[in-house]
Regions:
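N-terminal ligand-binding lobe of clamshell/alpha-beta domains
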Residues: 1-141
């Protein structure tokens, strides 16, 4: 059956992601949903699942889907990588280098800042698996 073949293909890709990332260092990642009035992806949503599949760890420990996050907490977390979601929730994101308090973040200093499409990285569905594979390549390059 064609549907089962497609589902099996997705399962195989998920397993391949998990296998490739087993034993690799885990990057601590902040996922920005909106700025200003900083809103982060919490551990309860698809964005955090994509991060985990890609071999990253969300620095936001709250189990909600979306979390209001203070700049002080972000600076204290000092993530290895920073993802900025672009889309309806964050239509014209300000580059990290242009934000006074963000310039010294480890992610900014290391050039580990990625702007991603909200449609692919924040919506459940087959494209989320594509997003995880893309993010894995970026995190582990």
């Amino acid at each position: 059956d064609k549907a089962q073949t497609i589902v099996n293909g997705w399962k195989s890709r998920v397993q391949a992601l998990r296998s490739r990332n087993a034993g690799k260092p885990v990057a601590r990642v902040f996922y920005e949903v909106r700025y200003p009035n900083l809103l982060a992806a919490g551990r309860g949503g698809i964005s955090s699942e994509i991060l985990a599949l890609a071999g990253g760890e969300n620095v936001v420990s709250d189990g909600k889907k979306l979390v209001r996050y203070s700049e002080e907490s972000l600076i204290a977390a000092d993530p290895d990588a920073y993802i900025i979601q672009k889309g309806p929730m964050n239509p014209e994101p300000t580059p990290l280098a242009e934000r006074d308090h963000y310039r010294d973040l480890r992610a900014q200093r290391a050039g580990r800042v990625l702007i991603v499409d909200e449609e692919r990285f924040a919506r459940p569905g087959p494209r989320a698996l594509d997003a995880a594979e893309e993010l894995e390549n970026w995190l582990h390059r």
